[in-house]
């Protein structure tokens, strides 16, 4: 990850790839703390639940962050993920065509997201792209590995004659450590009350770790992280 020195930050402008979930909300708080100015880019790509987009808007408004929402419907046409189908079971199912991966894996999603974010950053004159990818609570997603993001950064900069840097503050942090970072950056209450992680789109059940169904893998990981975070205090 880019070395963030005070002198470099005084003229740095960050773009957060922002879904409205726990990780990207934490990254938004982290970016606000470290960079001179911050924007957010959110992708409306036909995901299962509109609540993700709604919560991202709410969080961006509460933090006073400029948010660009890009709508496209490509993944549903390529269609190879339970995350795009409201009828699919996401509890512990394998991917339909890649059984060694979770059913929620969307092939090449991060590659496309980061490519579009890179193009937007060029247009806006932004110097850094912040993403919440993590290897610590590894879900089996190959596009959440450091090897992937470092190679993509180089490829995108070579292909556009740019020098935009990627930063990924959660790469080696598990969910408990992500809760701790949210607290450090002053956004823990916002993460608990407004961020959305649940694969089933449940905002009707409130637990100490936030809203969710408490049954899907995302809720399980978030609950486990919260309990570990509380135990560390």
Curated annotation (Swiss-Prot):
Which residues are listed for Zn(2+) binding in this entry? 198, 213, 216, 219
Q: Which residues cross the membrane?
A: none
What is the free-text note on the cofactor?
Answer: Binds 1 zinc ion per subunit.
Under the GO molecular function aspect, what terms does this record hold? ATP binding; ligase activity, forming carbon-nitrogen bonds; zinc ion binding
* Sequence positions that bind ATP: 18-28
NCBIfam families documented for this protein: 7-cyano-7-deazaguanine synthase QueC
Name of the protein: 7-cyano-7-deazaguanine synthase
Q: Which gene encodes it?
A: queC
